[in-house]
Structures are given as C-alpha cells and as structure tokens.
Amino acid sequence: MRARTPKRPKLAVWKFASCDGCQLSLLDCEDELLAIAGKVEIANFLEASRAVVKGPYDLSLVEGSITTPHDAQRITQVRKASKFLVTIGACATAGGIQALRNFGHVREFLSVVYAKPEYIETLATSTAIAEHVKVDFELRGCPINKQQLVEVLSAFLKGRKPNVSSASVCIECKRRGTVCVMVAQGIPCLGPVTHAGCGAICPAYHRGCYGCFGPKEAANTASLSRQLTVLGVSEEQRQRLYRTFNANAEPFRTESAHA
C-alpha cells in the first residue's frame, strides 16, 4: 500500500490597517520562502494569491492594527480559527503610524482628509492586535526583518520558541563598528531604547535611530530623555521623536506624554 503524504500545516496571512510592507517582506524572502512553501500549505495569503483554503489554520501571521468596528470583530474570528497567531510589524504590535490619532481627535483628522467624513466608520484609536486577542509571538519592525521572519516560521515548523534578539540597536551599532552618533555628533537617537532588528541602518548613515522596531524590553526612556535634554532637544522635539511608527507602544507613549 502506498504511504500517505504527511499533511502539511496550514499557514494564513491576514491584513488589517497597514501598508502591506510586512507582507512584502515575506514575499521578498524568495529562496527561503520557496523552501518553507514546500513544508506548509499557504492557505490564505491574498497579497500573493487569490486562492483561499478554509480554516482552521495552524499558524496565522497578522499584519496591521485595529481601526474599525468590523476589524475588531474580524480579528476574533481569525484568532478562533488559528492554533498559533503571530503579529508582524509595528502596526500589528503597537498600532502603527496611524496610532497618532490616539493623541488627538479623530474627527478632526477625518474632516481634513476626507471630503465626506460622515461616511467613514472608524474607531477613535488605532490599537495593537494584542489588545483584542491572545498573541503567541510578536515580530516587530517597520517593516519586519525578513531573516527574523524566516526564523519564526522555522521555529514553528520545528516546534520550538523563536530565537529573536531582545538587544537594542546600540548592540547592532557596536557589531558593525558604527561610531555612536549621539556621543560623537550630538545627534538625537532612540537606539538605546529601541529593539534590534534593523541592522542599525540609520546610525550607519549618520542619522539617529527613530525607533521603527519599537521599544526594547525594559527600555529606560526616562534616562534617554534626560540625555536628549542635555543635547539641547526641546520638549516638543522629544515628543515628536517618540511619536512615530510605535507611538502607542509602552514606554514610548508614556514618555512622549511627559515631554
């Protein structure tokens, strides 16, 4: 009798409020994606294919934040249909750049952007997926690091915990031999409080880190803010520094409120 082919785990990729950049990072994996594709069944990935296989799903990758009542309901359905759920990118893990609405009045923004704002159904805030459902792992970045994404997928296939660095961008600067832009040039930089993963691209080109990978674990933002003050950075400038792609992530949110 012919042996049965082992059933491949189902992978689903979901989009909420986002720019699709993190999904494109998955497609950009190229050779690595081809190897992984042979070990999983890509059941739902509208960025790559219109073909959809019904759940339940073994692993769901979720990009984007929750900004509408409909999406708040939809994410609960995705969670119910998924054995494991991993959020990918700043939008899904912290609310994204669109979370700047959380610090103002959303109706004022709508009146500026849309000719008929009364037709727009939206929530007053943009929130991370973890504020609505249980998340098994968060992969940060804007966009995500594709090597880290491959590590997460490989870890899932092997039944182990992903090995993703929890260090700061400062460590990445040291590893690539980049001179500290804040110490040497007095350039404001969020590197000491930002999660590693970008490869310290901005400091390598003499620009301060602007926190696209979000706050690292136990980030000492209060200490950094004091140093920024020494450098002559105003309260308004400090607030703008913390309020970018991960404005709604703690402790960036709290520290920006103190500025």
Give the label of every model feature segment.
Residues 64-66, 90:
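Short glycine-/small-residue-rich Rossmann-like dinucleotide-binding loops
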Residues 86-88:
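Active-site neighborhood of phospho(di)ester-bond hydrolases with catalytic His/Asp-centered motifs
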Residues 1-61, 71-72, 76-84, 107-259:
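Iron-sulfur (Fe-S) cluster-binding modules
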Residues 98-100, 152:
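Short secondary-structure transition/capping segments
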Residues 91-96:
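Short gly/pro/ser/thr-enriched loop/turn and capping motifs at secondary-structure boundaries
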Residues 102-106:
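Short, hinge-like loop/turn segments at secondary-structure boundaries
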